Amino acid sequence: MCIRDSCQSLEDLAEISDILVSVLPGGAETDNLINANVLKKLGPSGVFINVGRGNSVDDEALIEALRSGAVRAAGLDVYKSEPQIPDAYQTLENVILLPHIGSATVETRRAMGNLVFDNIRAFLEHDTLVSEVM
């Protein structure tokens, strides 16, 4: 149940939404969070968009919802097994598929470039890297 701007569950939010946009991070806690129950609540006029992480979507449930008309359409910019996209998505006319370009803005690319230079500088100066990958 949603009261004012606060929903008790993702299903409750989907039920009152026309468009559900996922910007969820990756990780075990978000695996298949967008599942058959959420999609059923979104309903036959609902649109699902994912620009977060592919692991958050139960692909089988979304494909079935799109095929059956349980959900109107989907726009996907991320996938569980990038760069492979499930074949079923490619056969559906109510899906728009993008090649993970949701972050392709001038500002984001500039920030990425600056981060590279900041890490190179830190490395050469024997300082702590800004975004060290272990």
Ranges and model annotations:
Residues 4-88:
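Rossmann-like adenosine-cofactor binding region
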Residues 2-3, 40, 93, 118:
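Generic cytosolic/nucleocytoplasmic N-terminal low-complexity/intrinsically disordered segments
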